[in-house]
Amino acid sequence: DELKFENINGKEVLYHKSVIKGDSSKNLLPVIVEKFISSLSFGKSMRWGGFSYEFIRPIRSVVAILGSELVDMEIYGVKSKMAFYPHRNYGYDMVEFGSIDEYFTALENNGIILQASKRRQKILNEFKAIEQNSGLKIELDEDLLDEVVAITEMPTALIGSFEEEFLEVPSEVIVTSMKENQRYFPLYDQNGKLSNHFVVVSNAISSDSNLIIKGNEKVLRARLSDAKFFWESDLASEFSSAKLKNITYLAGLGSMYDKEIRERDIARELAKIYEKELKYEFGGDFIDELDRAVMLSKADLTTAMVYEFTDLQGIMGS
């Protein structure tokens, strides 16, 4: 009796009609929140304790308030409370609060800026102050900025430096090491040249900022020492595409060397088609130059630098 037929636009449709009684927001909220949390997808997730739950980081506390009332709910084994964990520099015991107004005040008093927009603005304000005091310009990478906003609770921007001798290494290598390995922001002089300074956005709260700076300088120095070693090793080695024979391109399609040979053949055929235009642009020896350019286009895949910093593929060869 619950199934019915109805003619819709000349087609007979079988359907079921039911009325679901509404429920209170307080009862619906736990279900909605749990579905939302479960729907989130990350590149990498983790498990913790003896649980089978997966999330980007362990869930340690849950605050769920509707109006002025605590919503009784449990997310991934953690029950909601009128309490939260403070910033690690403030201690490890939960901080209790009595109302939503007290909650926001208690957070900031315990080293946590809840709103991402406020954390972002704090970082940008401190970036501006660093630029004014140093006379240098910060390269504002929006993706990196979003990342440091997301991983800090009370961000503080600090300026550090490294030895000028590392500037002998190509700037692309230094910047890549800073941004990808350490989440640092590079600083440039007024002429757009990379300086031996960087900005770190720290989540540590300390009265001695020099201690934080020195620690980050030590880590970066080790990274740049490795990069300098790779760079000097590559300079001492022959830059040859013959080494590409040891790198597989795709199963059934040979090595990267085979791919390069095919590309050189294609380039020569295209050069014949556009011979007149290319001669006018590059002169009579353009075919030899074109062939050499294609031959060297993949050669940096064999370098230690590209092996360590894969994003520099194509850049190191140039």
What are these regions (language model features)?
Residues 139-261:
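Catalytic nucleotidyl-transfer cores of nucleotide-processing enzymes
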Residues 16-19, 108-112, 127-132, 199-206, ...:
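Glycine- and acidic
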Residues 258-259, 270-318:
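Divalent metal-dependent catalytic cores for phosphoryl transfer on phosphate-bearing substrates
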Residues 21, 53, 67-71, 77-80, ...:
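Short, glycine-/Ser/Thr-/acidic-enriched flexible segments
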Residues 38-46, 71, 113-116, 132-140, ...:
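Intrinsically disordered or highly flexible coil/loop and linker segments, enriched in small
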Residues 148, 220, 244, 267, ...:
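Short alpha-helical scaffolding segments that buttress acidic/His motifs in well-ordered protein cores
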Residues 1-165, 174:
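Long, basic N-terminal domains or extensions that often function
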